[in-house]
Curated annotation (Swiss-Prot):
One of its GO terms (molecular function) is glycerol-3-phosphate dehydrogenase (quinone) activity. Belongs to the anaerobic G-3-P dehydrogenase subunit B family. One of its GO terms (cellular component) is glycerol-3-phosphate dehydrogenase (FAD) complex. Composed of a catalytic GlpA/B dimer and of membrane bound GlpC. This is Anaerobic glycerol-3-phosphate dehydrogenase subunit B. Conversion of glycerol 3-phosphate to dihydroxyacetone. Uses fumarate or nitrate as electron acceptor. It catalyses: a quinone + sn-glycerol 3-phosphate = dihydroxyacetone phosphate + a quinol. It comes from Haemophilus influenzae (strain PittEE). Pathway: Polyol metabolism; glycerol degradation via glycerol kinase pathway; glycerone phosphate from sn-glycerol 3-phosphate (anaerobic route): step 1/1.
Length: 432
């Protein structure tokens, strides 16, 4: 099978790159092994939330994105943002904002500055873009609603309203609020309660999607809110989009917000579903449940790849994009004595002091500190071309968290790196 571009990985980076290429006439295939990290994510995207701890002791929260992305180059020269340059990073981030608006992902935020989003535990985390159904505040501004009811679902343990309510008022933006907590009694969920493993956000959403006893649910929310102006609910209402949540908001006449629960996350799954629908509607091909095994090279180019399900049939393409993610998605593999990228056997880099073949450099003794192994990934140049055996391959690009040289967990930049590198690589391929 021959394509213009073959993309390995169907997460946020792979789908974003595929959509950008399909929109401009390229014929793409995405080889997708299964669920991606986006299915377990909060639904909020971070461009850069914190600066490295090496200089500032504790990680300093980022508010002004342009200023800090520029300063990041001095701290982490191998970070994808440092290689691309602040101007291109911000331009690609703004391109994604336009794409998200076009796809009706219902995201709010901008590259001007970060905002705070409320987490499922009641703390605040910096974010670049968040679903408009998630409660957010800008800087030190007070939350606009004084009386808040935090409502869980009886028997659902992946969302704890009492804990959230107690933590929420510890934040200066919410300390003036009157916050109560309670539980919704939804009889339609009794069948799910018989098996705790099935009582998850996805199962709840699928059952409620049919709007069974919708009026009863509306009545239960109104009564449980006890006169509150705003209601915080677990993200269990609406699997593919916000239509169900919007219907509830209109029917209750309340300011309803939803918060991410323990994974799987409906907020992240909605985004992946909408991105995938867009990619396929543009004519892109998704090969699901398959994984790339190895590649064949000709000089400094990739000629073809083989996959697990199509082992006897080569997939050839003019260009290849590695969007396989990090350890979670098996884009990187860790063995006792080495960390490696399994498909192309690309060169691996990390933060200063990290050595992929020296296990003692992978961790630091303090468990809660940033761990060097979290920065492992493939080496790239300013065009996001992948390095192998000391040379950059001309038609192999890397996007997203398979790239090394930075710790996405420490810096809060994983989804930003994913979309920025994806759109930058699309431009590189289209410019050929």
């Amino acid at each position: 099978m021959n394509f213009d571009v073959a993309i390995i990985g169907g997460g946020l980076a792979g789908l974003t790159c595929g959509i950008a290429l399909q929109q401009r006439g390229k014929r793409c295939v995405i080889i997708n092994n299964g669920q991606a990290a986006i299915d377990f994510a909060s639904g909020s995207l971070d461009l850069l939330s914190r600066m490295p701890s090496t200089t500032y002791g504790e990680n300093r929260a980022v508010e002004n994105l342009k200023e800090n992305i520029t300063a990041l180059r001095n701290e982490l020269p191998a970070h994808p943002y440092s290689l691309l340059g602040a101007e291109k990073v911000l331009a690609k981030a703004q391109d994604f904002e336009r794409l998200a608006n076009e796809l009706h992902l219902d995201l709010i935020g901008s590259t001007e500055k970060n905002h705070w989003r409320v987490t499922g535990l009641g703390s605040l985390r910096g974010a670049w873009l968040s679903p408009n159904s998630v409660p957010t505040v800008q800087g030190n501004e007070l939350f606009p609603h004084k009386r808040i009811a935090v409502l869980g679902i009886e028997g659902y343990h992946d969302f704890q309203p009492q804990l959230l309510a107690a933590n929420l008022v510890l934040n200066p933006q919410f300390e003036y609020c009157e916050v109560t907590s309670g539980f919704l009694n939804i009889p339609q969920l009794d069948e799910l309660r018989k098996n705790a493993r099935e009582f998850r956000s996805v199962n709840i959403s699928q059952l409620l999607e049919h709007k069974l006893a919708f009026k009863d649910l509306v009545k239960e929310i109104i009564e449980s809110s006890q006169g509150a102006e705003a209601v915080f609910l677990p993200a269990c209402f609406g699997l593919e989009n916000q239509e169900f949540m919007t219907a509830l908001r209109d029917a209750t006449k309340l300011a309803l917000f939803e918060l991410p629960t323990l994974p799987p996350s409906l907020l992240g799954m909605r985004q992946r579903i909408q991105l995938r629908h867009k990619f396929e509607s543009l004519g892109g091909l998704m090969i699901n449940g398959d994984s790339a095994l190895n590649a064949t090279f000709e000089g400094n180019k990739v000629r073809c790849i083989n996959t697990r399900l199509l082992e006897d049939e080569e997939i050839t393409a003019d260009n290849f994009v590695l969007a396989s993610g990090s350890f979670f998605s098996k884009g990187l593999i860790s063995e006792f004595d080495k960390i490696y990228e399994p498909v192309f056997e690309s060169d691996i880099i990390g933060v200063e002091g990290f050595n992929q073949k020296d296990r003692f450099t992978w961790t630091v003794h303090r468990f809660a500190h940033p761990q060097p192994y979290q920065s492992a990934g493939v080496a790239i140049n300013a065009q996001c071309q992948v390095k192998k055996c000391g040379q950059f391959l001309t038609n192999l690009y890397a996007v997203g968290n398979v790239i090394g040289g930075f710790n996405a967990l420490e810096l809060g930049c994983g989804s930003g790196v994913a979309v920025v590198t994806a759109l930058a690589v699309a431009d590189e391929i289209l410019a050929k």
